[in-house]
Amino acid sequence: HLRLPGVIGTVGKLKQGIEYASQEEMIKKAFSVKKAEAVAISINSPGGSPVQSHLIYKFIREQSKKNKKKVIVFAEDVAASGGYLIACAGDEIYANASSIIGSIGVIYSSFGFKDLIQKIGVQRRVYTAGKNKSTLDPFLDEKEEDIQRLKNIQLELHQEFINVVEESRSTKLNKTDVELFSGEFWSGKTSLKLGLIDGIGNAEQILREKFGEDVEIKKFEKSKGWLAKKLSSSEDHADKL
């Protein structure tokens, strides 16, 4: 049983995040346990990098096929956007009734500061080689062609996400719901009706139901860096005071 908590992508040395490079070894170890009938993965992520999400999703599926092990995924507080994409690596997905599931979409957001810098008397000077190098510069006026280019990229990424969900969930999806791929998110209870998950329950409960009360659950955790260990030790000490 391994856990994938946090934002997907590089978030810094002190903040916990989910990255392919830092999770690869732990995922390999989980699948290398010969006696294990299945690998359980708990996800608690609102999403993040689409690239890292796809890399982790594909690696889990590859390891599952290579080692002939079933993958059972459990959504904790949230498995949304890239978090749900990773969850689709599971042969089965479970969640709490109050978990947040879905958000099958792509988002880009920024600010425009052109009027602000003019108001405070700041001149913006940009020198580029390549006419599109300053695309979506927040200190310049938006260009319709730049917006359209961004939207086209978003549509491609969105379709890739949809393909993963449709391949993973196959006939389980309630495709009559027009909101399914709109970027909307739902509770675990509603997600079950939509076919985004297979059932309601937590990891230990479901694993006992499937493999018996005496099931042995081996836990895998990513090793912490020395600074994170130091801070964690300090927090534990403070809790005991």
What are these regions (language model features)?
Residues 1-96, 107-241:
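N-terminal organellar transit peptides
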